[in-house]
Amino acid sequence: MAKIGFIGMGNIAYAIMRSLLNKYKTEDITFTDLNRRRVAQIEKETGVKAVDTNQDCAENAKYIVLAIKPQFYDNVLADIKDHVTKENIIISIAPGITIDSVNEKLGGDRRIVRAMPNTPALIGEGMTGVCYDKKLFEETEKQMISNFFESFGMMEIVPEYMMNAVVCISSSAPAYIYMFIEALADAGVKYGMPRDVAYRMAAQGVVGSAKMVLETGKHPGALKDDVCSPGGTTIYAVSVLEEYGLRNAVIKACDACYEKCIDLK
């Protein structure tokens, strides 16, 4: 029996599975996906063998990862309802889908972990918000859950009411950050820099800045102030970002993301 089964193999699920293969054997993992061409490609790339149906996946893995879009949840949960037991641990990674809603559709009395990872999981640098009822899990299972998510980056245990916020500021954040990197690089190209050099410089600036926040423990505002010399070039750039509403644009974007999470319920 496989330890981990993925129902659905989109970008996030694939990123997670690739990272898990650094710790688990190929025979410990299985998956299903409707796209047969993608199934064949993933089997060839990873050595992980797919099973034919969602029911097969549920019956052949203890940890079942629901890696499907929210609009497909009802059909998939109905599909596997009679094939999961109290021994299974269901890991749901769809935005807006609550633990109670998954549990209810599986007949109740099931053990659900709700999580929201992001795509940097593909290179082992993911961030995942996780919530579950700890009373329902053995210590060895809790450790397995931690090992699962930490195999592709960092994790934070959060209360479930924060999960929509996790989507906004972490799961969706790579898209915002890629836009920022692209904008910086476009500016570099405007000034005559080769595009590949501009991308590397902009991306490393983001990586290094993020590490400064994580490793120094200093407030981001204080780190910003450290770069801004009185009357210098950086404070002039910062003043323009403030004038054009960078902070407000980011918060408004997160507001839109949050509202969409609510709609997905």
Where does each model-flagged region fall?
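Short pre-catalytic strand/loop immediately N-terminal to key active-site residues, enriched for Gly-Thr
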Residues: V113, M163-C168, P220-D225
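Small-residue helix-packing motif on alpha-helices
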Residues: I29, V39, C57, P194-M201, ...
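Internal alpha-helical scaffold of NAD(P)-dependent oxidoreductase catalytic cores
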Residues: S101, K105-R111, M127-V166, Y178-E215, ...
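NAD(P)+-binding Rossmann beta1-loop-alpha1 motif at the extreme N-terminus of oxidoreductases
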Residues: M1-D52, D56-E59, E125-G126, V189-Y191
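NAD(P)-dependent Rossmann-like dehydrogenase/reductase catalytic/cofactor-binding core
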Residues: A203-K265
